[in-house]
Every structure is written in C-alpha cells, then in structure tokens.
C-alpha cells in the first residue's frame, strides 16, 4: 500500500515538536498517496470493471477481499485471529467505501474520506491503542486501551480491525445502503 511507500518520509517528519510538519507530511505522503490511489484502483478500476463483467454483488465482494489482503503487508507479525480480524475489517471498510462510491456516483468523496482517515489515524495525529494500521502508535493524541482482548484492540493491525470498528463499518454501510434503496425507489 501507499503506507510502505511513505514510511521513510513519515519516520523523518513525525517527530515530537514538529506537529505541523508532521501533519503536512502525513497529509501528502500517507493521506493522498494511499487514500486516492487505493480508491482509484479498488473503487475506480477493479470495482467498475467487475461490475460490468461479473455483476454488482461480485464486484463488491471480490475487490473488498483483495483490499483487505493488501493490508496484511502492514502487519509485522500476525496470527490467525489477527488475520481474520483484518480480513473482516478490511472487507467491511472496503464495502463501506464502495457503497459510498455507488451512492455518490464518484470515487472522489470516498477518496477524500479515505485521505482524511489515513492522515488522522495513520499519519500520526490521532491514534487508539498501541498499534495503528500494523505499526507502533506514535500519534500526538493517543487514547489508550486497557484491554488485551484482540477483539477490542484489533490485534496486530490495531483498533481499525477491532470488533467495534467492524460494527461501525457495517453500520455506515447499512445506512448508505438505505439511502441508495430510497433513491432507487424514488426513481423506479
């Protein structure tokens, strides 16, 4: 992912006392690179191609699973539970972004949301727990997690792969799905 591409610049700029440089660096290297590139590839290219060739359901499911597995590279070590949580979380987040692209008829709103997510969470501004996106959490604002349960902490990927996050992705996806259905009912 774009995270590996940007690891060196971020490790240089994300130092205590250099908040604004860190924020700007995170925005450009992590946010834009990963957010826009992942949305372009997964929602803009793979999803659209599969939607035309395989139908809507497979076009949602297959890229979502690919998106999840791509993020395995972010984890230094993992066991079966870490992997299961990451695949569930990554797939759920990918489906959420896909529904957002379908609802808006564009990848740009999803790319903006993905960019902000990456900038704030992965870019070192805000983090929950000891691990963020498979890396040690060195964020400026850290909310500690007192639990050692991987179901809550997301294991070796971080809180983004925990059950609360997965429930959140699914809830947002269902909400977007309701809006899509309402629009279809108005048109149909």
Protein language model annotation of sequence segments:
Residues 1-8:
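Short, small-residue-biased leader/transition segments that mark boundaries at the very start
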Residues 13-22, 52-54, 154-155:
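Helix-boundary and loop/linker segments of multi-pass membrane transporters
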Residues 17-24, 63-101:
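Alpha-helical transmembrane segments and their immediate interhelical/interface regions
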Residues 22-35, 148-171:
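Hydrophobic alpha-helical transmembrane segments
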Residues 27-32, 36, 61-68, 83, ...:
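Residue-level signature of the transmembrane alpha-helical core
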Residues 37-62, 73-79, 99-109:
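Membrane-interface helix/loop boundary segments of multi-pass membrane proteins
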Residues 81-151:
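Functionally important transmembrane alpha-helices
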